[in-house]
């Protein structure tokens, strides 16, 4: 669980910014979306391969440009 202590003379906005950063770095939302429903291991590996292909194509296009 992500928690943030408010420091002396710190505004609520700064405290919220720190909380949001910690929240993103911890990967809470990403993990929640991943566990929202079950994905079979075979489907997961197929999706991983397609993501890698797309990433490689983008990198290749950027290097050629």
Curated annotation (Swiss-Prot):
Domain of life: Bacteria
UniProt entry keywords in alphabetical sequence: Ribonucleoprotein, Ribosomal protein
Family membership: Belongs to the bacterial ribosomal protein bS21 family.
A single cellular component GO annotation: ribosome
Protein name from the UniProt record: Small ribosomal subunit protein bS21
Pfam families per UniProt: Ribosomal_S21
Gene source species: Chlorobium limicola (strain DSM 245 / NBRC 103803 / 6330)
Record-level Gene Ontology MF annotations: structural constituent of ribosome
Gene3D superfamilies hit by this protein: Ribosomal protein S8
Organism ancestry: Bacteria, Pseudomonadati, Chlorobiota, Chlorobiia, Chlorobiales
GO biological process: translation
InterPro entries: Ribosomal_bS21, Ribosomal_bS21_sf
